């Protein structure tokens, strides 16, 4: 038998403590813009605590998760645009929302591929892909590859990370998204 090589016990403990400290410091940062220079819109924690509900702050800034089936938009079916609750960036159209049975609002596509940032998330001993607002870094939820066609994606988003702008008869919600409908495009060409 060959001798087994192990680290000296004090060195093992020190290494373990350093890894735990690094993990704790990494998870304590607000939002998903690790370096605020990467965020296009930056808010102070003080301002966010005043403006957001405790649940909205916990979800968007501390990467929390609201209870399943209890979010404001879980069963919401009105036409309109879902936006980031922190900065107002348009994220999802109501036409892409579907009932996944997961207990959280689910969408199969985003308004713009630039609206959301993806980050590997290894919390809770598993690998997932976190979704964050690319403008302000707010944690939104996660994306999975078990959604419906045409994308096969399921953006599983916390209601607390969203605000909603209803569509009205003039299509104002569509116009706010920066994405014109085909009917609006035709009118512009006339």
Curated annotation (Swiss-Prot):
Cofactor(s) for this UniProt protein: Zn(2+)
Catalyzed reactions: L-methionyl-[protein] + [thioredoxin]-disulfide + H2O = L-methionyl-(R)-S-oxide-[protein] + [thioredoxin]-dithiol; [thioredoxin]-disulfide + L-methionine + H2O = L-methionine (R)-S-oxide + [thioredoxin]-dithiol
Disordered: annotated segments: 166-190
Ranges for domain MsrB: 45-167
InterPro entries: Met_Sox_Rdtase_MsrB, Met_Sox_Rdtase_MsrB_dom, Mss4-like_sf
Residue numbers bearing the N6-acetyllysine modification: 40
Enzyme class: oxidoreductase
Record-level GO cellular component terms: endoplasmic reticulum; mitochondrion
Active site (UniProt): 156
Keywords, ordered alphabetically: Acetylation, Endoplasmic reticulum, Metal-binding, Mitochondrion, Oxidoreductase, Phosphoprotein, Signal, Zinc
Signal sequence annotation: 1-28
Enzyme Commission number(s) of this protein: 1.8.4.12, 1.8.4.14
Superkingdom of the source species: Eukaryota
Record GO terms (molecular function): L-methionine-(R)-S-oxide reductase activity; peptide-methionine (R)-S-oxide reductase activity; zinc ion binding
Annotated PANTHER family: METHIONINE SULFOXIDE REDUCTASE, METHIONINE-R-SULFOXIDE REDUCTASE B3
Function: Catalyzes the reduction of free and protein-bound methionine sulfoxide to methionine.
Subunit description: Monomer.
Family membership: Belongs to the MsrB Met sulfoxide reductase family.
The protein's name: Methionine-R-sulfoxide reductase B3
Species the sequence originates in: Pongo abelii
Gene: MSRB3
